Amino acid sequence: MALVHASSESSWRAPEPEASDAELDAVYRRLGQSVAIYAHIHRAYVRRISEELTVANTGSVGLPYDGDLRAAYLLLDGSTPSIRRVEYDVDAELKALSGCGLPHADWIARMLATGKPQMP
């Protein structure tokens, strides 16, 4: 199993879930493992590319970008990844965010409220 933030080539560039099997294969097969797990894009999914490769994204516990406001995490059963979702009080989180003094809190709140990336 290989774990990377985005890809073996970059901490910032990673394929989206809509990428073709060929693109995912080209990015993650070079890791030399049957399961490749990455993060960075905040969109949880598991996809079996071939008999030799499964690619998974961990999603995001607190700032999902897939429209599902529940916290997402990846669970491994041996080498089999699956996505789990947990409800939490998003309104309470938004309220806490509004008074915390964090730079760009309004921008982060828009993303948290929609579960989608937003322009600042």
Residues covered by each model-derived region:
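Conserved catalytic scaffold of divalent metal-dependent phosphoesterases
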Residues: 1-35
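Acidic, His/Gly-rich catalytic cores of divalent-metal-dependent hydrolytic chemistry
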Residues: 35, 48-120
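N-terminal start-of-chain detector that recognizes signal peptides
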Residues: 8-9, 26-29, 45-49, 54-56
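Catalytic metal-binding/acid-base residues of hydrolase active sites
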Residues: 7-9, 40-44, 61-62
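Short hydrophobic beta-strand that contains or immediately precedes a catalytic carboxylate
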Residues: 3, 38, 57
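Hydrophobic, aromatic-enriched interface-forming segments
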Residues: 33-42, 47
